[in-house]
Amino acid sequence: MEGPTHPKPSKDKTFSWDLIILVGVLLRLDAGMANPSPHQVYNITWTITNLVTGIKANATSMLGTLTDTFPTIYFDLCDIIGNTWNPSDQEPFPGYGCDQPMRRWQQRNTAFYVCPGHANRKQCGGPQDGFCAVWGCETTGETYWKPTSSWDYITVKKGVTQGIYQCNGGGWCGPCYDKAVHSSTTGASEGGRCNPLILQFTQKGRQTSWDGPKSWGLRLYRSGYDPIALFSVSRQVMTITPPQAMGPNPVLPDQKPPSRQSQIESRVIPHHPQGNGGTPGITLVNASIAPLSTPVTPASPKRIGTGNRLINLVQGTYLTLNVTNPNKTKDCWLCLVSRPPYYEGIAVLGNYSNQTNPPPSCLSVPQHKLTISEVSGQGLCIATVPKTHQALCNKTQKGHRGTHYLVAPNGTYWACNTGLTPCISMAVLNWTSDFCVLTELWPRITYHEPEYIYSHFENKPRFKRDPISLTVALMLGGITVGGMARNRNRDCGLLETAQFRQLQMAMHTDIQALEESISALEKSLTSLSEVVLQNRRGLDILFLQEGGLCTALKEECCFYADHTGLVRDNMAKLRERLKQRQQLFDSQQDGLEGWFNKSPWFTTLISSIMGPLMILLLILLFGPCILNRLVQFVKDRISVVQTLVLTQQYQRLGQWRLRPTVSPQLNV
């Protein structure tokens, strides 16, 4: 069981496995996910897969956002090994493997290390090496040197077997026996799983993009050959409840032209306060998911303009968002969606009131059949809900017997199969196959970060990343008038209630204007069809010589009543404002920036040649000086060498002291 001291030679870290090379290549060819909204809640599933057999070792699902759903995953080592570890029969005690209980038990006491395959490091090898061709490639594991990393995405450690019969390092281990084979063994587990592992995500793993599966290699640390196991970690993101259409109009989800319906005059009926202090309301009954608002004042004869009506919608949404989530409104853009659907429904939970007598909101007359084409979320459902819409239900009630009326809380509505209404009759609901979902109604206003809007003004052809936009309903869904006042303190609740009611009034005014627009469009289409039919009949008869087409037909002349002139005027004003903004924006740009906007290829060309051009310019500027310095330095070195050579050929004379000599004298 003892292995050599770390490090070991890398020659023991290779083996032939052509199938794993192919799997490793396929992992790098996976398509990425679309960038999602960071605030959207999804059903996220993390999967650990054996790359050799393709069997899932673990699949953990939970609800959350893409930025915080990183659970701790538990799986067994034998689930990512399978039958790939088959020690030689000539090795009676290999100490590893998953085919026998004794080998599974001995494998528990063997250290292991894990190497990432997503790093694409050449020195670490490929799948045939377990991405651990040399020492230093390991980033996590259970060894005596405790490998760590500051850049890898996961950590893998040993766990503890479940149940009261746990394994220890010194003797018998019941969980290592498969209860399907050894049913009489005490403590036997399913599949003999006694090598639990714990996988956790690091901070880098939480920040990376899991747009495809990422692979790792696990190797046992033992004397001789270190066996290899390959596994991958992947994330699957699914919406909890995809938006579904609610209402009798089956063509609106596809946004096709509406079918011609009978012209019904819009009638707004103000309701007097109830005995319990209720506020007047305006309701729409038997409408195809007709958007309406509950606590509003009676309609004024004078209708506000389109611009003011749209501004009130955005302003009411901003005030509500500012009160409930002020951090989101410090620097943001709220954009009103100009294409259908203009409203969306969010299914919520709430406490409705049960009344024996019909309230005033149930006595209104049907109006135009407006339909909300998107209902998402999970909320309270009444009656028998078909399987196609059960995803919208978090709680389902069968309703009540008898003649009862269920009134939705303030700020919410019953989205039924036959239309949107503030109250429902149980007698009608029990008699028909209708069903209802408690919903909130929100205008489709998207929330954008400031960088997204600025990029449009700068006319950038591309973005660094896909823009993230979400509707305000996703940020404020479930915040009703009653819910805000119930879940917060009294003063704050009253303030938020006032903001929410202001938004509701703006929505109601906008919906009434939409109804009037639909009526005007119906009249315009009817008038146009009459003109077309009359011209066709006149052209067939060709009685123009008798005084004209109308005289020949002996009927009143029909003329096209154009009720869309205001639309054309508004569009002309809009184009004029856009042109003025574009001129103002162009005047604030310099010439170089204008070149970049007019020629998209100019940016690519400049960025490609700028580097070599700068290098060439630096060489021309500083090249002569550097060359002179280099030549002077070489000359100095050569001069020193010549001086040394000449010095070695001569010997320096010493300083000898010269004494005076006395010449001999002769005596005469």
From Swiss-Prot:
Please list the residues annotated as glycosylated.
N43, N58, N286, N322, N327, N351, N354, N394, N410, N430
**Region of interest: Immunosuppression:** 533-549
Q: Where is this region: Fusion peptide?
A: 467-487
Q: Where is this region: Disordered?
A: 243-264
- Please indicate the ranges of residues that lie on the Cytoplasmic side: 627-668
Residue span of motif CXXC: 332-335
**Cysteines joined through disulfide linkages:** C115-C132, C124-C137, C332-C335, C332-C558, C550-C557
Q: Which residues lie on this side of the membrane: Extracellular?
A: 35-605
Signal sequence segment: 1-34
The record's annotation in Gene3D superfamilies points to:
1.10.287.210, ENV polyprotein, receptor-binding domain
Site positions (Cleavage) are: R465, D466, L644, V645
Q: What is known of its domains?
A: The 17 amino acids long immunosuppressive region is present in many retroviral envelope proteins. Synthetic peptides derived from this relatively conserved sequence inhibit immune function in vitro and in vivo.
PANTHER family the UniProt entry points to: BC035947 PROTEIN-RELATED, VIRAL ENVELOPE PROTEIN
Q: Quote the function comment for this protein.
A: The surface protein (SU) attaches the virus to the host cell by binding to its receptor. This interaction triggers the refolding of the transmembrane protein (TM) and is thought to activate its fusogenic potential by unmasking its fusion peptide. Fusion occurs at the host cell plasma membrane. The transmembrane protein (TM) acts as a class I viral fusion protein. Under the current model, the protein has at least 3 conformational states: pre-fusion native state, pre-hairpin intermediate state, and post-fusion hairpin state. During viral and target cell membrane fusion, the coiled coil regions (heptad repeats) assume a trimer-of-hairpins structure, positioning the fusion peptide in close proximity to the C-terminal region of the ectodomain. The formation of this structure appears to drive apposition and subsequent fusion of viral and target cell membranes.
Entry protein name = Envelope glycoprotein
**Organism listed in the record:** Feline leukemia virus (isolate CFE-6)
Gene that encodes the chain: env
